[in-house]
């Protein structure tokens, strides 16, 4: 145990000075070190800080018993070879807790010295970069050697870990092979990966067996006229009665919450067998259709945004709308208000970025009579009072000062305001919708927005996609503009294709400006009679806009384009549910996530 890692100096410079020579470190390790530093993990830990008591470990083992009983035999088969190579093998659950370990006595002895034992929590946030915690975080096999570990507790160890997934792509746990650094073996990672793959197949087979047994127990209920479903432990539907099969043909594998979205409520729940639950349902009256006084296109991004708006409108939670200038944040905020229980109350919009800092306080909180020279005789009601029993929309929330953030936080916490110059607190009953063209989380991380205020406002974030990411909606937007302005315009296909290629930095607002120019220039709407250059000139677009916009990150191969198109269709079919989309695509969820990042897609794509 006295080997000295080659890159110890790299580690020392990073933990002491925050300087990292990334050329000397693998990308995955560098990313993990940055995560650890951000999470304030102690790099000088000499042993694992958290080990469960036996009763807690028993509870944890029971919670993950299906994973443990399925994967442990593979660990036991591996042991003779592991012991011969003076290593140890471990099974870790999805929470990062060591459930089982065995191996060579010397390895076990050294492991005990750093609390690397059953019941230890070995996540990145607990002990820094390590094969187990990093594999859990990135959901990929990984090997960590010597001082690549973030905490010194593991600097004299070499570890290789591979994640084990359930059939739906969710993480079941990790298998790890570790040894003192001096006894490293070149095939450690390969062995761990092979065992993880075998355990995954066994988990999938046993899950299917378990589900078949549950379906058998569900029995005649499947032919019943009473709406009911059989769900597994993750509340995915594995069998259903006739009313559900009829109303939801794609019921298999769907999540229980999707039935709630379709108007069903749970009347009763009965346990069936090991891990099965039969939910008896009743169909609720259809709710009023969601009204949106704008236009929602048919693209996946637009439909996903509408779904999130509809969900948020049904609650009274604070909503944070984010999107570039011109994406329609105020229109979305009004839609939330008009479809909520507060729709009969006032909707008050305040642009925090347009009000001088010395006036924002009186604009929001109002002032009492005689509060200052020039004050109105009877005082002034601020936005919070005006919005009482309704909705207050705070646009460009990232522009308010820190002192105003403190005052705003207090109102959000206590639901009371005190006007400037006033002495009495006034209760207010409001819903707050905030909006920003920036990333609010990034503003909080950079200290521009207080973290406590961020968590108050960022309860249900909704991103409004830029027009360049949903150009297939342009024909719908054109039709909306025509109807709203009573203009009989037509949209030539070649001109529409050029509009789809434009980058639209001003988003929908810029697009509508183009439509307005065209309606003024061609009041009869006969755009098809005009040449493409004439239309571009009338629209105020440069002739070069007919050229294709540059690819964001390089040209995709034919195969990659097919993969991307399939993923978009799967996400649309699954309504943004990544696990379901991965299942539809027939690929593991971890791979699906990697491709989301690769193709710059989001769950709302």
From Swiss-Prot:
CC annotations in GO: protein-DNA complex
GO MF annotation, one: ATP binding
UniProt xrefs under SMART domains: AAA
Domain Sigma-54 factor interaction, residue spans: 295-520
Any Gene Ontology biological process: positive regulation of DNA-templated transcription
Signal sequence, renumbered to the chain: none
Function: Acts as a transcriptional activator of the acoABCL operon encoding the acetoin dehydrogenase complex.
Protein name, as recorded: Acetoin dehydrogenase operon transcriptional activator AcoR
Organism: Bacillus subtilis (strain 168)
Lineage: Bacteria, Bacillati, Bacillota, Bacilli, Bacillales
């Amino acid at each position: 145990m006295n080997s000295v890692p080659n890159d110890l100096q790299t580690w020392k410079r990073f933990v002491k000075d925050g300087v990292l020579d990334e050329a000397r470190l693998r990308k995955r390790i560098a990313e993990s070190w940055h995560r650890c530093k951000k999470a304030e993990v102690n790099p000088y830990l000499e042993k694992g800080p958290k080990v469960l008591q036996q009763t807690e470990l028993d509870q944890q083992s029971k919670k993950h018993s299906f994973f443990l009983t399925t994967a442990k035999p593979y660990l036991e088969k591996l042991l003779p070879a592991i012991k011969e190579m003076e290593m140890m093998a471990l099974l870790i659950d999805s929470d990062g807790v060591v459930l089982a370990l065995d191996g060579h006595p010397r390895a076990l002895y050294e492991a005990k010295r750093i609390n690397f034992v059953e019941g230890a929590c070995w996540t990145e946030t607990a002990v820094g970069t390590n094969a187990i915690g990093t594999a859990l975080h990135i959901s990929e096999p990984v090997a960590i050697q010597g001082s690549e570990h973030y905490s010194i507790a593991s600097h004299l160890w070499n570890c290789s870990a591979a994640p084990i997934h359930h059939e739906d792509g969710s993480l079941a746990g990790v298998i790890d092979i570790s040894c003192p650094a001096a006894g490293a073996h070149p095939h450690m990672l390969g062995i761990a990966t092979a065992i993880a793959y075998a355990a995954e197949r066994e988990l999938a087979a046993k899950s299917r067996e378990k589900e078949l047994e549950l379906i058998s127990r569900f029995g005649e209920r499947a032919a019943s006229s009473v709406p009911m479903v059989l769900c597994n432990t993750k509340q995915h539907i594995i069998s259903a009665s006739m009313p559900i099969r009829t109303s939801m043909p794609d019921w298999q594998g769907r999540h229980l919450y999707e039935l709630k979205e379709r108007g069903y409520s749970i009347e009763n729940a009965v346990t069936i067998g090991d891990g099965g639950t039969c939910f008896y349902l009743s169909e609720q009256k259809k709710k009023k259709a969601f009204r949106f006084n704008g236009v929602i296109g048919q693209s996946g991004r637009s439909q996903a945004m509408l779904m999130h708006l509809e969900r948020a409108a049904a609650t009274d939670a604070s909503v944070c709308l984010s999107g570039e200038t011109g994406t329609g944040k105020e229109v979305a905020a009004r839609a939330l208000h008009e479809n909520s229980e507060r729709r009969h109350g006032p909707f008050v919009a305040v642009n925090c970025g347009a009000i001088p800092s010395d006036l924002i306080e009186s604009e929001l909180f109002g002032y009492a009579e005689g509060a200052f020279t020039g004050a109105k005789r009877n005082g002034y009601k601020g936005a919070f009072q005006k919005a009482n029993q309704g909705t207050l929309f705070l646009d460009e929330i990232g522009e308010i000062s820190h002192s105003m953030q403190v005052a705003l936080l207090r109102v959000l916490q206590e639901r009371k305001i005190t006007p400037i110059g006033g002495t009495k607190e006034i209760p207010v009953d409001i819903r707050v919708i905030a909006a920003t063209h920036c990333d609010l989380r990034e503003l909080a991380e950079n200290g521009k927005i207080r973290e406590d205020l961020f968590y108050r406002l960022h309860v249900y974030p909704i991103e409004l996609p830029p027009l360049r990411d949903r150009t297939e909606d342009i024909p719908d937007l054109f039709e909306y503009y025509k109807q709203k302005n009573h203009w009989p315009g037509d949209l030539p296909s070649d001109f529409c294709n050029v509009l789809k290629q434009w980058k639209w930095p001003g988003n929908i607002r810029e697009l509508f400006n183009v439509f307005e120019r065209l309606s003024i220039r061609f009041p009869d709407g006969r755009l098809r009679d005009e040449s493409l250059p004439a239309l571009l000139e009338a629209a105020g677009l440069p002739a070069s806009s007919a050229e294709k916009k540059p690819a964001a990150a390089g040209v995709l191969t034919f195969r990659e384009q097919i993969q991307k198109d399939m993923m978009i269709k799967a996400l649309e079919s699954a309504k943004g549910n990544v696990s379901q989309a991965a299942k539809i695509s027939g690929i593991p969820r971890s791979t699906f996530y990697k491709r989301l990042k690769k193709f710059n897609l989001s769950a709302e794509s």
